[in-house]
Amino acid sequence: MVKICCIGAGYVGGPTMAVIALKCPAIEVVVVDISKPRVDAWNSDQLPIYEPGLDEVVKECRGRNLFFSTDVEKHVAEADIIFVSVNTPTKTRGLGAGKAADLTYWESAARMIADVSKSDKIVVEKSTVPVKTAEAIEKILTHNSKGINYQILSNPEFLAEGTAIEDLFKPDRVLIGGRETPEGKKAVQALKEVYAHWVPEDRIITTNLWSAELSKLAANAFLAQRISSVNAISALCEATGANVSEVAYAVGKDTRIGPKFLNASVGFGGSCFQKDILNLVYICECNGLPEVANYWKQVIKINDYQKSRFVNRVVASMFNTVSGKKIAVLGFAFKKDTGDTRETPAIDVCHGLLGDKAQISIYDPQVTEDQIQRDLSMAKFDWDHPRHLQPTSPTAFKQVSVVWDAYEATKGAHGLCILTEWDEFKTLDYQRIFDNMQKPAFVFDGRNVVDPEKLREIGFIVYSIGKPLDAWLKDMPAVA
């Protein structure tokens, strides 16, 4: 029986291994993690991450050929194929701080694999890593090999949170990068055979190691670039009276461009986009390509600009101050159908409003109060380090309350900011919300979720990103 072990039970490792176990009943799959609370959660009815369809997959396989354990060394030693799905956060200190990937967890995983292995292994990079990481990992393993052969493969994930299970069931492509040696090709074939249980052969792409590593960074950079492009156009739409939804629809009808990732918003978030672009920037700088580095930096600059522009619009519209005013925030996750708050634009928007002494009431159907307070009190990039290295008792913001009901959040509020595109926000009773808010009542729609005209008929003053401005907003100070 082939044995697979995955180091890291997070957003990538957990769902990926659950689907492999479901599709390959003859393979034993063990997900290991040093965090006991996380492993306990995977072994309970309350999984540590929210992902549509994940519960059903885990329940079907767990205890049959899918296991979750903290006994890392035992399962690594027994495995034929080891997936490494540990965090590669952005460095917060030292060389490359603020840009380069921190490979501390990857390196310690590689050293542990070398220490405990007694048989040949295929080691698979699943986390997003800088180009040439495989080379560094290979050196650690071969210098500590004790006669054991290791083959390193790159098999980057292309999951979108909120649709991860669907993406795993029907992937656009599975990418496997390996050494172009007989042993390397054999390792690639072994991993291909795992995916071939459910992925059509024409969707399994094989490349060299470096192409696979760079493809993941490039894919995320291209997606983020599209979001920043449409967000840049949204600012121009507001200035000229154009409607960004109409512009994006017209542009997306060009088959060379297509309609995906052309929704203007308050900005992109999530664990990958910013981190991977910063990593790309650092790699370009290290390879003497400053012009290329500056090009990709601009994608992040536009994203930061969009978030600050949104905050400025809120403050400017409300008589140039939100001090002491209650602002309701609907949505804190970085997008709908996930509880993930990593790099969510909501953090920057809340910080901007708190800086002007606003009172904030937050509602998100999937994010806990503890997580929100932790996110608001944490230094940038600390979110991507293991929980035990994060502040244990984050400083709670007294101006922030977290509630479990949208109507409670908006009661008595002066303004309402929609920061995540949860479907339920489209069907709220906005007449009821209006009746319970202070007047004039403002709605700032950072995800273009609501129909601005319908809300104006109720009596709201509405700002929707990239849409023609309300007469009220036109009279307020210009927002840059």
Swiss-Prot record:
The EC number of this protein is: 1.1.1.22
Residues passing through the membrane, by range: none
Active site (record annotation): C272 (nucleophile)
Its UniProt entry gives the catalysed reaction(s) as: UDP-alpha-D-glucose + 2 NAD(+) + H2O = UDP-alpha-D-glucuronate + 2 NADH + 3 H(+)
Q: Which InterPro entries match?
A: 6-PGluconate_DH-like_C_sf, NAD(P)-bd_dom_sf, UDP-Glc/GDP-Man, UDP-Glc/GDP-Man_DH_C, UDP-Glc/GDP-Man_DH_C_sf, UDP-Glc/GDP-Man_DH_dimer, UDP-Glc/GDP-Man_DH_N, UDPglc_DH_euk
Q: In which pathway does it act?
A: Nucleotide-sugar biosynthesis; UDP-alpha-D-glucuronate biosynthesis; UDP-alpha-D-glucuronate from UDP-alpha-D-glucose: step 1/1
Q: Does the keyword Oxidoreductase apply?
A: yes
Positions carrying Phosphoserine:
S393
Mention one GO biological process in which this protein takes part, according to its record: glycosaminoglycan biosynthetic process
Which residues of the sequence carry a binding annotation for substrate?
157-161, 216-223, 256-269, 334-335, 447
Residues annotated as binding NAD(+) are 8-13, 33, 38, 86-90, 127-128, 161, 272-275, 342
Q: Which Gene Ontology CC terms are recorded?
A: nucleus
Leading EC class? oxidoreductase
Q: Which UniProt keywords apply?
A: NAD, Oxidoreductase, Phosphoprotein
Per its database record, what is this protein's job? Involved in the biosynthesis of UDP-glucuronic acid (UDP-GlcA), providing nucleotide sugars for cell-wall polymers.
Under which name does UniProt file this protein? UDP-glucose 6-dehydrogenase 5
Q: Give the organism, scientific name.
A: Oryza sativa subsp. japonica
User: Which gene produces this protein?
Assistant: UGD5
